Amino acid sequence: MSTPFYVSPQQAMADRAEYARKGIARGRSLVVLQYADGIVFVGENPSRALHKFSEIYDRIGFAAAGKYNEYENLRIGGVRYADLRGYTYDRDDVTARGLANVYAQTLGTIFSSAAEKPYEVELVVAEVGETPEGDQIYRLPHDGSIVDEHGSVAVGGNAEQISSYLDQRHQDGMSLAEALKLAVQALSRDTNGTQREIPAERLEVAVLDRTRPQQRKFKRIVGRQLDRLLEADGATTEAESSAEEEDE
Protein backbone atom coordinates (compact mmCIF):
# COMPACT_ATOMS: atom_id res chain seq x y z
CA MET A 1 0.00 0.00 0.00
CA SER A 2 1.47 3.35 -1.03
CA THR A 3 1.99 6.14 1.47
CA PRO A 4 -0.47 9.06 1.01
CA PHE A 5 1.14 12.14 -0.50
CA TYR A 6 1.65 14.77 2.22
CA VAL A 7 1.52 18.52 1.69
CA SER A 8 2.19 20.76 4.67
CA PRO A 9 -0.55 23.29 5.55
CA GLN A 10 1.91 26.13 4.89
CA GLN A 11 2.66 24.84 1.39
CA ALA A 12 -1.01 24.25 0.64
CA MET A 13 -1.93 27.81 1.61
CA ALA A 14 1.02 29.22 -0.34
CA ASP A 15 -0.09 27.30 -3.43
CA ARG A 16 -3.67 28.57 -3.06
CA ALA A 17 -2.43 32.15 -2.66
CA GLU A 18 -0.24 31.85 -5.76
CA TYR A 19 -3.15 30.42 -7.75
CA ALA A 20 -5.42 33.32 -6.75
CA ARG A 21 -2.77 35.98 -7.42
CA LYS A 22 -2.08 34.66 -10.92
CA GLY A 23 -5.79 34.68 -11.72
CA ILE A 24 -6.19 38.26 -10.51
CA ALA A 25 -3.10 39.41 -12.43
CA ARG A 26 -4.62 38.17 -15.69
CA GLY A 27 -7.41 40.72 -15.33
CA ARG A 28 -7.18 44.36 -16.35
CA SER A 29 -6.03 46.88 -13.76
CA LEU A 30 -8.30 49.46 -12.16
CA VAL A 31 -7.63 52.36 -9.85
CA VAL A 32 -9.58 54.20 -7.17
CA LEU A 33 -8.50 57.73 -6.21
CA GLN A 34 -9.67 60.41 -3.82
CA TYR A 35 -10.23 63.86 -5.28
CA ALA A 36 -11.50 67.11 -3.77
CA ASP A 37 -15.22 66.33 -4.10
CA GLY A 38 -15.22 62.58 -3.65
CA ILE A 39 -13.78 59.32 -4.95
CA VAL A 40 -13.27 58.35 -8.61
CA PHE A 41 -13.11 54.81 -10.05
CA VAL A 42 -11.22 54.33 -13.33
CA GLY A 43 -10.53 51.17 -15.30
CA GLU A 44 -9.94 49.91 -18.82
CA ASN A 45 -13.04 47.97 -19.80
CA PRO A 46 -14.03 47.46 -23.46
CA SER A 47 -17.36 45.89 -22.43
CA ARG A 48 -20.39 48.11 -21.92
CA ALA A 49 -22.47 45.28 -20.45
CA LEU A 50 -20.12 43.98 -17.75
CA HIS A 51 -19.14 46.56 -15.14
CA LYS A 52 -16.13 46.62 -12.84
CA PHE A 53 -17.66 49.37 -10.70
CA SER A 54 -21.07 49.42 -9.06
CA GLU A 55 -23.14 51.19 -6.45
CA ILE A 56 -23.74 49.24 -3.25
CA TYR A 57 -25.63 51.83 -1.21
CA ASP A 58 -26.11 55.58 -0.84
CA ARG A 59 -22.46 56.54 -0.26
CA ILE A 60 -20.76 53.22 -0.95
CA GLY A 61 -19.17 52.02 -4.18
CA PHE A 62 -17.67 48.68 -5.20
CA ALA A 63 -14.78 47.87 -7.54
CA ALA A 64 -13.32 44.48 -8.41
CA ALA A 65 -10.64 42.82 -10.52
CA GLY A 66 -10.45 39.15 -11.41
CA LYS A 67 -13.09 36.62 -12.45
CA TYR A 68 -16.35 38.36 -13.28
CA ASN A 69 -18.74 35.64 -12.13
CA GLU A 70 -17.04 35.44 -8.73
CA TYR A 71 -16.97 39.16 -7.96
CA GLU A 72 -20.48 39.62 -9.36
CA ASN A 73 -21.76 37.12 -6.80
CA LEU A 74 -19.99 39.09 -4.08
CA ARG A 75 -21.43 42.37 -5.36
CA ILE A 76 -24.98 41.02 -5.31
CA GLY A 77 -24.44 39.69 -1.80
CA GLY A 78 -23.17 43.10 -0.70
CA VAL A 79 -26.22 44.88 -2.11
CA ARG A 80 -28.53 42.48 -0.28
CA TYR A 81 -26.62 42.93 2.98
CA ALA A 82 -26.75 46.72 2.67
CA ASP A 83 -30.45 46.82 1.79
CA LEU A 84 -31.39 44.51 4.66
CA ARG A 85 -29.29 46.38 7.21
CA GLY A 86 -30.58 49.77 6.06
CA TYR A 87 -34.19 48.55 6.20
CA THR A 88 -33.82 46.79 9.58
CA TYR A 89 -31.89 49.54 11.35
CA ASP A 90 -31.10 52.86 9.70
CA ARG A 91 -29.52 53.95 6.42
CA ASP A 92 -26.64 55.51 8.36
CA ASP A 93 -25.83 52.08 9.83
CA VAL A 94 -24.73 50.84 6.40
CA THR A 95 -20.99 51.57 6.23
CA ALA A 96 -18.07 50.59 4.05
CA ARG A 97 -16.31 49.18 7.11
CA GLY A 98 -19.24 46.88 7.89
CA LEU A 99 -19.46 45.74 4.28
CA ALA A 100 -15.70 45.14 4.14
CA ASN A 101 -15.96 42.94 7.23
CA VAL A 102 -18.68 40.84 5.57
CA TYR A 103 -16.59 40.43 2.41
CA ALA A 104 -13.50 39.59 4.49
CA GLN A 105 -15.34 36.79 6.28
CA THR A 106 -16.62 35.36 2.99
CA LEU A 107 -13.28 35.52 1.18
CA GLY A 108 -11.36 34.22 4.20
CA THR A 109 -13.67 31.24 4.61
CA ILE A 110 -13.43 30.31 0.94
CA PHE A 111 -9.65 30.77 0.87
CA SER A 112 -9.03 28.51 3.87
CA SER A 113 -11.46 25.80 2.78
CA ALA A 114 -9.78 22.85 1.06
CA ALA A 115 -13.13 21.79 -0.40
CA GLU A 116 -13.21 24.59 -2.99
CA LYS A 117 -10.77 26.72 -4.92
CA PRO A 118 -9.99 30.26 -3.71
CA TYR A 119 -11.74 33.16 -5.39
CA GLU A 120 -9.62 34.87 -8.05
CA VAL A 121 -10.79 38.36 -7.08
CA GLU A 122 -9.52 41.49 -5.39
CA LEU A 123 -12.08 44.01 -4.16
CA VAL A 124 -12.19 47.69 -3.28
CA VAL A 125 -15.00 49.05 -1.10
CA ALA A 126 -15.18 52.85 -0.86
CA GLU A 127 -17.42 55.25 1.04
CA VAL A 128 -17.52 59.00 0.47
CA GLY A 129 -17.79 61.15 3.59
CA GLU A 130 -19.09 64.64 4.22
CA THR A 131 -15.47 65.85 3.97
CA PRO A 132 -12.34 64.33 2.40
CA GLU A 133 -11.20 63.32 5.88
CA GLY A 134 -14.32 61.16 6.18
CA ASP A 135 -13.65 59.16 2.99
CA GLN A 136 -12.95 55.46 3.47
CA ILE A 137 -11.27 53.07 1.02
CA TYR A 138 -10.71 49.39 1.82
CA ARG A 139 -8.86 46.88 -0.33
CA LEU A 140 -9.67 43.20 0.13
CA PRO A 141 -7.23 40.68 -1.40
CA HIS A 142 -8.15 37.08 -2.20
CA ASP A 143 -7.40 35.81 1.34
CA GLY A 144 -9.97 38.03 3.07
CA SER A 145 -7.56 40.44 4.74
CA ILE A 146 -8.56 44.12 4.91
CA VAL A 147 -6.17 46.91 3.94
CA ASP A 148 -7.17 50.48 4.83
CA GLU A 149 -6.03 52.69 1.94
CA HIS A 150 -5.72 56.45 1.61
CA GLY A 151 -5.35 58.60 -1.50
CA SER A 152 -5.15 55.96 -4.20
CA VAL A 153 -5.22 52.20 -4.71
CA ALA A 154 -4.77 49.90 -7.71
CA VAL A 155 -5.83 46.26 -8.11
CA GLY A 156 -5.57 43.66 -10.88
CA GLY A 157 -3.02 43.39 -13.69
CA ASN A 158 0.25 45.15 -12.89
CA ALA A 159 -1.21 46.78 -9.76
CA GLU A 160 2.13 47.07 -7.98
CA GLN A 161 3.69 49.21 -10.72
CA ILE A 162 0.56 51.36 -11.03
CA SER A 163 0.35 51.87 -7.26
CA SER A 164 3.96 53.04 -7.18
CA TYR A 165 3.26 55.50 -10.01
CA LEU A 166 0.18 56.88 -8.24
CA ASP A 167 1.89 57.16 -4.85
CA GLN A 168 4.51 59.45 -6.37
CA ARG A 169 2.03 61.74 -8.14
CA HIS A 170 -1.32 61.72 -6.35
CA GLN A 171 -2.06 64.78 -4.21
CA ASP A 172 -4.86 65.67 -1.82
CA GLY A 173 -7.36 68.18 -3.17
CA MET A 174 -7.01 67.27 -6.85
CA SER A 175 -9.88 68.18 -9.15
CA LEU A 176 -11.86 65.41 -10.82
CA ALA A 177 -10.21 66.17 -14.17
CA GLU A 178 -6.73 66.01 -12.63
CA ALA A 179 -7.46 62.75 -10.80
CA LEU A 180 -8.98 61.20 -13.92
CA LYS A 181 -6.00 62.15 -16.09
CA LEU A 182 -3.57 60.78 -13.51
CA ALA A 183 -5.52 57.51 -13.37
CA VAL A 184 -5.48 57.13 -17.15
CA GLN A 185 -1.75 57.88 -17.28
CA ALA A 186 -1.12 55.19 -14.66
CA LEU A 187 -3.27 52.62 -16.46
CA SER A 188 -1.57 53.44 -19.78
CA ARG A 189 1.87 52.40 -18.58
CA ASP A 190 2.94 48.94 -19.74
CA THR A 191 5.09 46.67 -17.59
CA ASN A 192 8.19 47.75 -19.55
CA GLY A 193 7.50 51.43 -18.75
CA THR A 194 6.27 52.49 -22.19
CA GLN A 195 3.10 54.55 -22.56
CA ARG A 196 0.13 53.48 -24.69
CA GLU A 197 -3.10 55.28 -25.49
CA ILE A 198 -6.42 54.18 -24.01
CA PRO A 199 -9.35 55.69 -25.95
CA ALA A 200 -12.27 57.09 -23.98
CA GLU A 201 -14.64 54.42 -25.28
CA ARG A 202 -12.52 51.74 -23.56
CA LEU A 203 -12.66 53.48 -20.18
CA GLU A 204 -15.13 52.78 -17.42
CA VAL A 205 -15.38 55.74 -15.03
CA ALA A 206 -17.62 56.34 -12.03
CA VAL A 207 -17.59 58.67 -9.03
CA LEU A 208 -18.89 58.95 -5.51
CA ASP A 209 -19.58 62.70 -5.51
CA ARG A 210 -20.18 64.25 -2.09
CA THR A 211 -21.55 67.44 -3.70
CA ARG A 212 -24.52 65.70 -5.33
CA PRO A 213 -27.79 66.85 -3.72
CA GLN A 214 -29.25 63.35 -4.10
CA GLN A 215 -28.95 60.84 -1.29
CA ARG A 216 -27.25 58.42 -3.68
CA LYS A 217 -23.76 59.73 -4.49
CA PHE A 218 -22.71 57.15 -7.11
CA LYS A 219 -22.70 58.27 -10.74
CA ARG A 220 -21.20 56.90 -13.95
CA ILE A 221 -19.30 59.30 -16.20
CA VAL A 222 -19.78 58.58 -19.89
CA GLY A 223 -20.03 60.24 -23.29
CA ARG A 224 -19.47 63.97 -23.64
CA GLN A 225 -18.86 64.50 -19.94
CA LEU A 226 -16.01 61.97 -19.97
CA ASP A 227 -14.53 63.49 -23.14
CA ARG A 228 -14.56 66.97 -21.59
CA LEU A 229 -12.88 65.77 -18.42
CA LEU A 230 -10.13 64.08 -20.42
CA GLU A 231 -9.54 67.00 -22.77
CA ALA A 232 -10.12 70.20 -20.79
CA ASP A 233 -8.42 71.66 -17.73
CA GLY A 234 -9.49 71.48 -14.11
CA ALA A 235 -11.69 74.44 -13.13
CA THR A 236 -13.47 74.85 -16.47
CA THR A 237 -14.16 71.15 -16.75
CA GLU A 238 -15.49 70.88 -13.21
CA ALA A 239 -17.95 73.72 -13.86
CA GLU A 240 -19.12 72.17 -17.13
CA SER A 241 -19.55 68.76 -15.51
CA SER A 242 -21.58 70.21 -12.65
CA ALA A 243 -23.80 72.11 -15.06
CA GLU A 244 -24.30 69.02 -17.20
CA GLU A 245 -25.26 66.96 -14.14
CA GLU A 246 -27.83 69.57 -13.10
CA ASP A 247 -29.38 69.38 -16.58
CA GLU A 248 -29.85 65.60 -16.35
Swiss-Prot record:
GO terms for biological process, alphabetical: modification-dependent protein catabolic process; proteasomal protein catabolic process
GO annotation, cellular component aspect: cytoplasm; proteasome core complex, alpha-subunit complex
Keywords: Cytoplasm, Proteasome
UniProt activity-regulation remark: The formation of the proteasomal ATPase ARC-20S proteasome complex, likely via the docking of the C-termini of ARC into the intersubunit pockets in the alpha-rings, may trigger opening of the gate for substrate entry. Interconversion between the open-gate and close-gate conformations leads to a dynamic regulation of the 20S proteasome proteolysis activity.
CDD domains, alphabetized: proteasome_protease_HslV
Ranges where the record places region Disordered: 229-248
Compartmental location: Cytoplasm
SUPFAM superfamilies, alphabetized: N-terminal nucleophile aminohydrolases (Ntn hydrolases)
Function noted in UniProt: Component of the proteasome core, a large protease complex with broad specificity involved in protein degradation.
Family the UniProt entry places it in: Belongs to the peptidase T1A family.
Subunit record text: The 20S proteasome core is composed of 14 alpha and 14 beta subunits that assemble into four stacked heptameric rings, resulting in a barrel-shaped structure. The two inner rings, each composed of seven catalytic beta subunits, are sandwiched by two outer rings, each composed of seven alpha subunits. The catalytic chamber with the active sites is on the inside of the barrel. Has a gated structure, the ends of the cylinder being occluded by the N-termini of the alpha-subunits. Is capped by the proteasome-associated ATPase, ARC.
Protein name, per record: Proteasome subunit alpha
Organism of this sequence: Streptomyces scabiei (strain 87.22)
Gene from which the chain derives: prcA
